[in-house]
From Swiss-Prot:
Pfam families according to UniProt: 7tm_2 (PF00002), Methuselah_N (PF06652)
Native source organism of the sequence: Drosophila melanogaster (Fruit fly)
CDD domains according to UniProt: 7tmB3_Methuselah-like, Mth_Ecto
Segments in the Cytoplasmic topological domain: 272-280, 334-353, 426-466, 520-585
Name the record gives this protein: Probable G-protein coupled receptor Mth-like 10
Length: 585
């Protein structure tokens, strides 16, 4: 008897996958390693509101201490009236995009919620001094400051107008990063930039759109002999320690997408896998792959946030992500439904049920898309209640306020909770069925129920397979999304929030994990081998049929070209089988 060849099991692939994820996380945490040119600080988590008791996040506020207070609770901030409902008490400040410092309580106003803000690195007429690591008034500096400072601003109609910085914008004073460099287009052509009316900036050389709180305006000069300052933007240093989160996650998603495509192909081409679970998994992966592709495009190619392309990719990503989450709930429900002990259904009923699932998943995703689009484009809701897709700053959802909870994380939270409940109920049911079967097999009447040892082994294998399917689905599609939600609520300004880099990366690599756990299994690889063998055998059979057809046709053509004879009537070979020819075609 030949020796049985043992192939690598699922545990080995899981170990390799986990090792790869951990290596990527460690690589991401190494400081000073940029991915691409001019990578920016991580862009989503620092937009979350730190304290639910304040009206907006810190980066949309200005310090109102010392400014005029009106009886109705509003403030006058250099001619801009900040209403009372947008005024709050803060006991912290941010010294950079990722560092929070506790300070004495002071009043701040959300002026950026109703007027475009522009950030200056230091209070006006102060300069940054690296020795004291702060802003100072340099009395030895005799250079002249522009009064008033004039800037070329590009508006939505693509016109560029020279405007007074202080009248066009509400001025913030904040240094986004410890290490920064200024753009100087007078000396470097690659330092050209465009400032937009919403306070964002486009760096022309690499087409990078930078948000208002990711850069600041700074006084610059070209030569030491210059006696006047010119105002230009300063960017975060491309080797900032926190600069690679979004970039590495985007590349992880790009790495994951081909594995999703391979998994989809396997489950569509193998007949044994085209059951209800397989088709639901394919639909989930289609939604996830299109969503990942759209998100990678807007993050890596820096699409103009004011253009139509930005909106198209943003809403496309939103629709397919929501569709994927709906299919996630379908998978959980169908798994729970199958373990309830319901009677089997025929093929027609299965197709009907899949059609219902499809209408449910894509239909609800379409409803969410319509609701989100109307909220952004067709309503006069406050800016902090709009999703932010294609608003001139974001191509994806605006994570700077709790509106993201309404349009994205809220529905996901509901789905994850429902899925977790169904997973727990399914686990309880599986455990109960396994105990019952163990009792039956051990009983004296087991021969009446499972008459052969082969039947017993088959049911044990089936039960273990179902439990393994349940466990894989729960780990990949339940735990990872749950940690993503926790990561959103926690934010990234806490020291231990770096732990969520692992879950973020696991989510980005979900396609790779699914491929390893659902395709690189012994049974599935065996089905793939059988499928390839059957296709190869079918090809050989068709080639044989084609050879027979060619020979018969040659005889027929020879007979047709011969001159008919009375003594020898025309005979055309009947060996060409019309049915076989049709099959070949």
């Amino acid at each position: 008897m030949p020796k049985k060849i043992h192939q690598p099991g699922g545990s080995l692939y899981c170990g390799v996958t986990l090792l790869g994820v951990l290596c990527l996380v460690v690589f991401r945490l190494i400081p000073g390693i940029p991915f691409g040119t001019y990578v920016m600080a991580e862009r989503d988590h620092y937009h979350t509101i730190d304290d639910p008791n304040v009206p907006c996040n810190f980066y949309d506020t200005v310090n109102l201490t010392g400014h005029r207070l009106f009886p109705n609770g509003s403030y006058d901030y250099y001619g801009t009236i900040v209403p009372a409902e947008l005024v709050g008490t803060y006991d912290y400040i941010h010294s950079s995009l990722t560092e929070r410092i506790e300070v004495r309580e002071h009043v701040r106003g959300c002026v950026c919620k109703f007027k475009s803000c522009l950030n200056i690195c230091c209070p006006w007429r102060q300069v940054f001094n690296s020795e004291v690591d702060g802003c100072i008034i340099d009395h030895s500096d005799n250079r002249t400051w522009p009064d008033p400072p004039m800037l070329n601003i590009t508006f939505r109609n693509e016109s560029t107008i020279l405007v007074n910085m202080f009248t066009q914008f509400a001025i913030q004073s904040f240094r986004p990063c410890p290490k920064m460099f200024s753009l100087q287009p007078e000396t470097n052509n690659w330092d050209d930039y465009l400032l937009f009316e919403n306070g964002s900036m486009l760096r022309v050389d690499d087409k990078l759109l930078i948000r208002k709180n990711e850069f600041c305006m700074v006084p610059t000069y070209v030569n030491e002999s210059d006696m006047f300052y010119t105002i230009h933007p300063a960017n975060c240093d491309m080797q900032d320690d926190h600069s690679t989160v979004k970039i590495i996650n985007s590349y992880a998603m790009m790495f994951s997408i081909p594995f999703m495509m391979l998994t989809i192909a396997v489950y569509l081409l193998i007949p044994e896998l085209r059951n209800q679970h397989g088709k639901s998994l394919v639909c989930y992966l289609i939604g996830l792959s299109v969503g990942y592709s759209s998100l990678c495009y807007v993050q890596l190619y820096q699409v103009d946030a004011t253009g139509v392309t930005c909106k198209v990719f943003g809403y496309t990503a939103y629709f397919f992500f929501m569709g994927a989450y709906m299919w996630l709930s379908v998978i959980s429900f169908d798994l729970w439904h199958n373990f309830r002990g319901t009677r089997g259904i025929n093929r027609f009923q299965e197709k009907k049920r899949f059609l219902f699932y499809s209408l449910y998943s894509w239909g609800i995703a379409l409803v969410f898309l319509a609701f989100t689009y109307c909220a952004q484009q067709l309503t006069n809701l406050p800016a902090n209640l709009k999703p932010g897709i294609g608003d001139g700053v974001y191509c994806w959802l605006d994570m700077s306020n709790w509106a993201a909870m309404i349009y994205f994380y809220g529905p996901i939270l509901a789905i994850v909770v429902a899925n977790t409940i169904m997973f727990i109920m399914t686990a309880i049911k599986i455990h109960g069925v396994q105990r019952e079967m163990a009792r039956i097999i051990a009983s004296e009447n087991s021969t009446k129920n499972l008459r052969t040892e082969k039947d017993k082994r088959f049911y044990r294998a089936w039960s273990n397979y179902r439990f393994g399917l349940f466990l894989r689905l729960f780990l990949i599609m339940g735990i990872t999304w749950l940690t993503e939600l926790i990561s959103y609520f926690v934010g990234s300004d806490k020291g231990w929030s770096k732990l969520f880099y692992i879950s973020d990366l696991a989510n980005a690599m979900q396609g790779f994990l699914i491929f390893m756990l659902f395709v690189m299994k012994k049974k599935v690889k065996h089905l793939i081998t059988n499928r390839c063998s059957s296709v190869r055998d079918g090809s050989n059979q068709r080639q044989s049929q084609y050879s027979t057809k060619t020979t018969s046709s040659s005889v027929a053509n020879l007979s047709l070209h011969e001159k008919p004879s009375v003594e020898k009537p025309l005979v055309i070979s009947s060996s060409v089988d019309p049915q076989k020819t049709t099959i070949f075609r």
